[in-house]
Amino acid sequence: MKKTIQRGLFTGALVLLTAMTSKPAHAAVNYQALVDADVKKFQGYFLKEFPGVKLEDFGDGVYALDEDSRKQWKEMEEFPPYELDVEAGKALFNKPFANGKSLGSCFSNGGAVRGMYPYFDEKRKEVITLEMAINECRVANGEKPYAPKKGDIARVSAYIASISRGQKIDVKVKSKAAYDAYMKGKEMFYAKRGQLNMSCSGCHMEYSGRHLRAEIISPALGHTTHFPVFRSKWGEIGTLHRRYAGCNENIGAKPFPAQSKEYRDLEFFQTVMSNGLKFNGPASRK
C-alpha cells in the first residue's frame, strides 16, 4: 500500500473545487443530484491518488494507506483503549433522569442510530449532529448538557457508535436550505485561514498520504466515519468537533465552539462526501 505520491498539488484541488461549486440557477433544481455529482468527483480524486485502496477502506484513515501503520493499529484495536469509555457510555445512556426517563427514551432502535446523523432538520433549518441530539435530549428532560468536546458526551457517542457499526452513510440534501448548509460546510473545507494560511483540503487532499514529521497526513475521505476517537495525544476519547478545533489551532486560526453552526455544517459536508462508506467508530488514533 506504500507508494510515492506525485501530483500537481494546487492544480488538482483547484480543478476539483471549481467542478464542485456550481450553484443552482433556479428553485426547480435537483439538489441531491448536484451533491451526488460532488461526491463522485471527491471520492474519485482519492481513488485515483491511491489506486491500491478500496473505497470502503478509507474509513480506516491513514491506516488504509500504510501497511506498517495498519499492522500496529490492528494490534492496538485488539485491546481498544476506548473500551471502558464505551461501557461508561452505555451506563450513561441507560441511566434514569430525575423524571424517570433516560437518553434511551429519546433514540429509536435501542440507540443504534449513528447512521441517522448528521441530518438537516427542515423545520429548524439547521444541521443536527449526534452530540447535539444527545444534549438536547438531556435539556428537554430537565438535565444539564454535557460539555461538548470530551468526557461524557464522547462516551455516550462512543456507545451509540459501537452498536451502530456497519450502518451505511447516506446523508441526503434535498432542499435549498439543506444545500445552503452543505455549501457553507464546503466553503469552510476549502477556505484558507490562520497564520499558516492553510485549509482542510490543503492538508487532507493535496498532502494526504505524505509525512508531516513522523506522522502520515490522513485523507479527507472517511474522516467522519470513526468518531469519537481515543487519541494517544489526548490520552482520552474526544469528539469530531474537538478534532476540528485542534486542527484550527494547529494552523493558527481561532477555533469555533464545538457544535457551532460552522462546525456542524462542516461535519455535514464531510459526511456527505463519505456517502457509501460505513460508520466504524469509535476508533483509536495517534
Curated annotation (Swiss-Prot):
Q: What is the effect of changing R155K?
A: In strain: NCIB 8346
Q: Does the keyword Lipoprotein apply?
A: no
Where does it reside? Periplasm
Which Gene3D superfamilies does this UniProt record tie to the protein? Cytochrome c-like domain (1.10.760.10)
Consequence when changing G44S: In strain: NCIB 8346
The cellular component terms of Gene Ontology attached to this UniProt record, alphabetical and capped at eight, are: cytochrome complex; periplasmic space
Q: Which consequence is recorded for altering A140K?
A: In strain: NCIB 8346
Q: Where does substrate bind?
A: R243
The effect of K125G is:
In strain: NCIB 8346
- The Cytochrome c domain covers which part of the protein? 180-286
Give the Enzyme Commission number. Answer: 2.8.5.2
The record's account of how the chain is modified after translation: Cysteine persulfide at Cys-247.
NCBIfam families per the UniProt record, alphabetical: thiosulf_SoxA
Function text = C-type monoheme cytochrome, which is part of the SoxAX cytochrome complex involved in sulfur oxidation. The SoxAX complex catalyzes the formation of a heterodisulfide bond between the conserved cysteine residue on a sulfur carrier SoxYZ complex subunit SoxY and thiosulfate or other inorganic sulfur substrates. This leads to the liberation of two electrons, which may be transferred from the SoxAX complex to another cytochrome c and which then may be used for reductive CO(2) fixation.
Q: What is this protein called?
A: L-cysteine S-thiosulfotransferase subunit SoxA
Organism, scientific name: Chlorobaculum thiosulfatiphilum (Chlorobium limicola f.sp. thiosulfatophilum)
Q: Organism classification, top ranks? A: Bacteria, Pseudomonadati, Chlorobiota, Chlorobiia, Chlorobiales
Gene encoding this chain?
soxA
